[in-house]
Each structure stands twice: as structure tokens, then as C-alpha cells.
Amino acid sequence: MKKKAVILYSGGLDSTTCMAIAREEGFEPYAMSFDYGQRHSVELATAKANAKTMGASEHLVVSFDLRKVGGSALTADLDVPKEGIGAGIPVTYVPARNTIFLSFALGWAEVLGAFDIFIGVNALDYSGYPDCRPEYIAAFEATANLATRAGVEGTGRFVIHAPLIAMTKAEIIRKGLALGVDYGRTHSCYDPTPEGLACGLCDSCRLRLKGFAEAGVTDPVPYAVRSKK
């Protein structure tokens, strides 16, 4: 019988590839997505449409409103930067987002009897978010085994899998294509147009387009503008 794994699944390029990797490694995926008041809710609609296609046995969407907290261009009335990828932590960082997401995933994993959680964080072609680093993943894994009944009673050890963390975006794309991922059914933009098109200029779009260019593949997603940098 396959081992269950909870996959943090946004509907974007990285999390979709992560789901495909979990399947390749023999896990039964249980997808978890979040409706947290994000301005790029097109991505969530993509996740809802494609979770079953990607092989998820279940798809759980958790709703809460981080707009009440604010502090990010994704959850507050702040402009999403379009000038290019800068230094430092950008305004698109959502305070403690991955900690919140992983905590929900940990709770569901414990209920499911799953000890494996997959998250598509990346520390190479990324925007500089502090909760995408290897040391953060290691620290949360340690916390997971201290903060749960299963961890304390020793019935199992939780593992946080971050298979993309040391891969370039081009390597991620090549891996996904080798596993049959249809990237035309993913969405990564932070600030889509009213029609749902990727803007092509935010950090996420720039990193995605750069990855496809370096992989020698055309991105199948339509863009309002296709950034060259």
C-alpha cells in the first residue's frame, strides 16, 4: 500500500512539479490549498481544477483571511513590483505564510496517519523569502516532531520534503516535463489581469519565463507581456 503524503499545492509551477515528484516517489498525494485572501486567486482556481488530474486522492482547500493581517502586496493594498527582481525581501513576502501553511499540513497529516509533507520551496531561482531556505525547512521538521502526538509517542517521524530547494527553475521545468506535467495548466503570476492573464512583469512571472527560456522550452501560459529579463 502506498504511503500517504500531504502536498502543499497552490496550482503554480513549483507545487505542481512537487506533486508529480511525490507520485513518482510512490506516495499517495493528498493536496492542500489555501484561500487566504490572496490577490492572485487565479492560481487557486487552477489548483481546484487540476488537483484530481494531478493524482490527488483528496483536495482540501482551507480558507482564512490574511488580509486582516496585511503586510504584503499579495494581501494588502500595495503595488506588486514590476521593475525586476531586486535585492532583499520583497513586499510580496507574506508574513509567516509557509509556517502557517505547513502547520495546517502537519495537522492534516497527523489525522491522515501520514508522516510525509511536500512543499515546493526553492532557494536558487526565487525572490529571497526567508521561509524558502533549507535551514527553515529543517527547523520546521524538528518542530513537527516535537509538537505532535505522533512525534512525542514515537509512532512515526515526520519528514518535510522540499525536492526543488536546490534546483534552478530550468531544472524544475525539465523535471516536470519528464514526469508529464502540463505547465499550460499552471498559474504563477502575483498580479494577473482582470481577464486572468499572467502579467509577465512580477517577480514570479520573470522567474518562470527565465526558467522556460533556460530550459529551451516555450511557456504555454498566455501573458499580457512577456518579459525578456
UniProtKB/Swiss-Prot annotation:
Keywords recorded for this protein, A-Z: ATP-binding, Ligase, Metal-binding, Nucleotide-binding, Queuosine biosynthesis, Zinc
UniProt: ATP binding residues: 9-19
UniProt remark on cofactor binding: Binds 1 zinc ion per subunit.
GO BP, one annotated term: queuosine biosynthetic process
Gene Ontology molecular function terms on file: ATP binding; ligase activity, forming carbon-nitrogen bonds; zinc ion binding
Pathway the protein acts in: Purine metabolism; 7-cyano-7-deazaguanine biosynthesis
Catalytic activity: 7-carboxy-7-deazaguanine + NH4(+) + ATP = 7-cyano-7-deazaguanine + ADP + phosphate + H2O + H(+)
Binding site for Zn(2+): 189, 199, 202, 205
InterPro entries linked: QueC, Rossmann-like_a/b/a_fold
Cofactor(s) for this UniProt protein: Zn(2+)
EC numbers on record: 6.3.4.20
Family: Belongs to the QueC family.
Known role: Catalyzes the ATP-dependent conversion of 7-carboxy-7-deazaguanine (CDG) to 7-cyano-7-deazaguanine (preQ(0)).
Entry-linked HAMAP family: QueC
Name of the protein this chain belongs to: 7-cyano-7-deazaguanine synthase
Source organism of the structure: Geotalea daltonii (strain DSM 22248 / JCM 15807 / FRC-32) (Geobacter daltonii)
Gene this chain is encoded by: queC
